[in-house]
């Protein structure tokens, strides 16, 4: 994957960069793995805004992704690499030996025509999914389970990965994308390799309209709002002296918002880097 740059024929094009989509197959999505996706506009079932700055955007269909990789010891051939509007990563269509089709996250280096497999006996190869106890130390992995059989939860965005650092008793020690060191059960599944589309974070949208296509609405700074709407609002002209806060009054810089006692604290060996 590479980034495509544009000639500055308009101000918005000057710094715009997009993916060249060269790694994608020229095929239509698999219909049996599509579902309707209703837009919420950031509202919950009461109609109240629970996620600000969401709304509009292009119509999408949801691609059903296999995060569990639970077809054990059945080889699958990569039929296509496809775009998914619902995530930053690309997805790969697998056709299993028994005829079933499934989408998975496409790791970097996976190509059409290759064969992948899940299970303890699978070889250490990009795209294969194995329990952590069968993966060598130092291997980069993604789509990692927190609980056996519940499906991958960690390292699923474009370009992300975790590194297997050690094995202690029933647990593996993983270095997370954030830098946190965390224990995960050795029986949890993980997929070999780094999630593809690693240049995604370097893309520049160039204009406000492109973010609107993605369903993002404008963010208004708290300082320019009224006192009734934001703790930092009001004042004559530009006023200072406020501690930076969220719209709900929580300090915005350096204030710890993680709950004091969480059940999962015992699995964290080293906290993430600030």
Swiss-Prot record:
Region (Disordered): 223-274
One BP term from GO: cytoplasmic translation
Gene3D superfamilies: 2.30.30.30, Nucleic acid-binding proteins, Ribosomal protein L2, domain 3
Alphabetical UniProt keywords: Ribonucleoprotein, Ribosomal protein, RNA-binding, rRNA-binding
GO molecular function terms noted in the UniProt entry: rRNA binding; structural constituent of ribosome; transferase activity
InterPro entries associated with the record: NA-bd_OB-fold, Rib_uL2_dom2, Ribosomal_uL2, Ribosomal_uL2_bac/org-type, Ribosomal_uL2_C, Ribosomal_uL2_dom3, Ribosomal_uL2_RNA-bd_dom, Translation_prot_SH3-like_sf
Pfam families given in the database record: Ribosomal_L2 (PF00181), Ribosomal_L2_C (PF03947)
GO cellular component, one term: large ribosomal subunit
Function: One of the primary rRNA binding proteins. Required for association of the 30S and 50S subunits to form the 70S ribosome, for tRNA binding and peptide bond formation. It has been suggested to have peptidyltransferase activity; this is somewhat controversial. Makes several contacts with the 16S rRNA in the 70S ribosome.
Family per similarity comment: Belongs to the universal ribosomal protein uL2 family.
Subunit note: Part of the 50S ribosomal subunit. Forms a bridge to the 30S subunit in the 70S ribosome.
Protein's name in the database: Large ribosomal subunit protein uL2
